[in-house]
Structures are given as C-alpha cells and as structure tokens.
Amino acid sequence: QVINFDELTTLIGNNSSGKTAALVALNTIFSENSGDRNLERSDFFLPKDKDPEELEEQSLYVEAVFHFNELQKEQGSTTYSIPTFFDSFVVDAPGHAPYLRIRLEATWEKSSNIEGSIESKVYYFTCPELEEITDEKKRIASRHDLNRIRMIYVPAVRDPSKQLKNASGSMMYQIMNSINWKDTTKESVKGIIQDLNDEFLKESGISILKDAIHDEWEEYHSDSRYSNAQLRFNSTNIDSAIKKAEVVFSPTVVEREYSIDEMGDGLRSLFYISMVDSMLDVENKIREEIESGEELSFSKTPPILTIVAVEEPENHIAPHLLGKLIGKLRDISKKCNSQTILTSHSPAIVKRISPEELRYF
C-alpha cells in the first residue's frame, strides 16, 4: 500500500484498519528511541490461508520517499538539509528534482528461539522507483544520518508525563543539555548553589542530621573510599542542576505552583503538544543561527524534518478546544522543519480537515 502525505495528513477508517500500523511502521525507521525500532514476530504479515507453524521465513519492507520543496521551488536555503543526503539522492531524468528513498528491510526465520530470529537493516536506494533494485543501488543508512529525520509519535493511549519531565532523552532535556553555557555563568551558578547549601547547613537541625549521617556511615564503612558522607541539597554544577528543571503552572486554586503531575489528563495532553511546538520553534532558531553563521546558543544540530504523529487528538480534550488544537497542529505542519500526521474517529476533527488531506483505510 502506498500512502501520500501532505504537510498535514489525517488517517481515518474503521478500528483495526491499519492506521496505527502505518504510524508504527514509520516510527520503526525514524524514532529516536531504540526500543521503538525493534521488530516483533507479529509485525510480519500472516496470510489468511497459512498456518504460522508451517512458515519457515517471512520478509517485509517499509519505504519512505522524501521530496525537498526547496529544490522543487528553487527558493529557500538549501545549505542545511541537502548535504546530509546528497550522495543518496535519486533523479528520475535530467531536469527533474532529486528525491530520497529510505527503506527498512527485515526478515523473520524460524529458529530455536520461540519468537524466531529477526534481522533488519535500513538502506538508501539510489535508483528511481520504477527501476529494478540491484545490490549496487543499495547503501546502508547510518543511524547518525537517519537521526536527521525524527518522528515524534503520540499514541492514542498516552502518558505525557514521561516527556514533560526533564528526564534523560526527553525533548526538553536534549535542548537544555545542548545550551552553550558561558564559563562565567557556570562559575556564577556553582558559587550560588554552594552558598545555598551553606545556608541550609547553618540550621541546627540540619547540622545534627548531617553529623549523624556522617558518623554512623563511618561505623558501617571502614574503607577509605566513599568514607565521607555529606548532606547536600543542590547539585554543585550546572549540568546536574538542569536535570532537575521542570515546568510549573500558576496561578492555582491553592497558594503554590502546580507541577505537570497535578494536572488533568486533558491539560497534560494539550501541554505535551504545546511542548513539541515549543521545541520545534527552538530548533528553527538553532537552524537560523547555523545558516547565518552567528554565535551558536546551542551545540545541538537539530533534525532536518520532524514528523509529528498524533493518534486520536480528541482523547481527553474538551470538545470546545478541538478547533484550537487542530489549528495548532496545522501551524506545526506549516513550519519549515515539520510535518503532521493525525488519526481520528471524531467528526469534530474530520470536519476541520480538507478532503484532500484525508486518507481512508
């Protein structure tokens, strides 16, 4: 099956018609999370008239074809996106715009393992789509290069807290960890944090607790290594401090700020999509700095394209907010570095989508 994607594309159809399978297939190639890229036995198609026990081997492939609008329109900057994939471009004929073919190929074989053995590789295909594929036209695609195309997949059953916390691997952590901190800022923050720790330790109760921890540890541990146990309230370097950064909300019905964990499912889902939008804005600014040769605020090299795939955005969202949500998802799709894919069963969503942007499964 071939699916054509626009800037914003909405997949509709019955339950179990393949909408999620299409998104998971793309996620298997372009997810930043290595766990999402693992294939399972159930990913391979089982023909209706076949007994699974009779099968010795199966294969599958998923191919993604990318066109570069800046080349087709002969406008806009080409310095950022083109060099990464230049050697892998395909041109059908003289005067035609080049495009990129990326294909995941996988095989399953029966083995002593109860699930069988699965091998998969991702290739660049350097021949036109209508030509026969030969080994000479296949090149292994490195994960380093594939990371220039990223997919953010938001499933229908979602736990936004995992991404909203500044945990290792989250969007916010990746951005904050790549900030080019000035040396003077690092030293200043280190001094302020040390002063804060010293202020805590001036309290008699804290001092009693600190001494008890230190003295009892000496009784339990006789080795010179790790012998000095000290109570510390804040990390003494900026890298450790930013790991504890989080977004808080105010005003609230009580006299304190709320963390994301205290918000309802609907607000958490909305804020998660808002965070994706924010990170794409930041990455656009990073891209502008790189292309203009300015002093870089970040060491991160952002992806060329981010595919934002949201299943059933209507989940947990009040009906009167759906119009605004679809409007924001459409805004994301219009950014130069992103594309949006939705799935939905909701008439309130579908009526806000142009017929040309619908794909029926």
Model-identified regions with their sequence ranges:
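Extreme N-terminal "head/tail" segments of very large remodeling/mechanoenzyme assemblies
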Residues: Q1-N15, L23-E70
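Glycine-rich phosphate-binding loops of NTPases
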Residues: S34-E57, E70-Q194, S207, E257
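Switch/communication elements of ASCE P-loop NTPase nucleotide-binding domains
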Residues: Q1-S31, I242, S250-F361
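Solvent-exposed residues in well-ordered beta-strands and their adjoining turns
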Residues: D6, V65-N69, T107, V157, ...
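Non-catalytic alpha-helical coupling and interface elements of nucleotide-dependent molecular machines
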Residues: S17, N27-G35, N69-L71, E109, ...
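Beta-strand secondary-structure signal
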Residues: V2, Y61-V65, R101-E105, E246-V248
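Short glycine-/polar-rich loops that comprise or flank the Walker A/P-loop
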Residues: Q58-V62, P98-I102, N147-M151, I304-L305, ...
